[in-house]
Amino acid sequence: MCIRSSVPMLFSSFARFVFVTVVTMTVVGGTASAAQPAYQDPKTPSLPDPGMRLDLKRTALVVIDPQIDFMSPKGKSWSIVGESVTEQNLVPNLTRLFRAAKQAGVMVMISPHYYYPHDHAWKFQGPLEILQHNLKMFDRQGPLTLEGFKGSGAEFMPEFKPFIEDGRTIVASPHKLYGPQVNDVVLQLRKQRVDQIILAGMAANLCVESHLRHFLELGFEVAVVRDAVAAAKLPEGDGYLAALINFRFIANGVWSTDQTVERLTRQERLTGQN
């Protein structure tokens, strides 16, 4: 009887041991996973590297919305994008990209965001459109006047002006929502025989990702500079993380600023030797 009664007890003890072990492993594993930086690349990626290689004669740096309202503490959206802009060291990284692109002699293009009074009379809008209009982001007094533009949130960041206002940078007509379907970015790129794009700017999960998707569908080869983009952080989600996942899935390259500058510099040297 003693032997029989000990069997359930042994089984019960073993079951408790297994349960505690599994729970402990799960908790520890979960803690370890949670401790990993949210934006860190996987240690063993399952997706192949597309192997994008720059040809400077066919390359352009396209920067989206490099404007005060998106990138400056003085901007109207700073309360929702400021944390991400700061985390990514966005403005210094973009400055480095501008400088490297100019030194390498590649085309530089700006796809800006402007809203005019008639844009505030739209009959229907999405959530982010409403938010932008409520904040009066990128507002200008009209398409044919620069009155009130200087120093406004629609103006380019002061750090970038030496590169943008050098007489060689192409400033496209404005996009209105997220993608470049309604401005002349693609036309300008095609007219310069550009088919490789280095993409940066704001906001990562909105305008940057929309430009990326449209460029890819039109046959461009596109690398996104992962620390030269940023996005809003809201209760609905982290826009940067959402974008980063999709960049990994669809872009021809997801590079850091360091990697991009190194690629531009290396190709510049190789071009100079030929």
Predicted regions and their residues:
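A short alpha/beta connector and helix-capping loop motif
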Residues: 57-59, 75-101, 106-107, 112
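Short, well-ordered beta-to-alpha junction loops that form the rim of enzyme active sites
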Residues: 111-114, 202
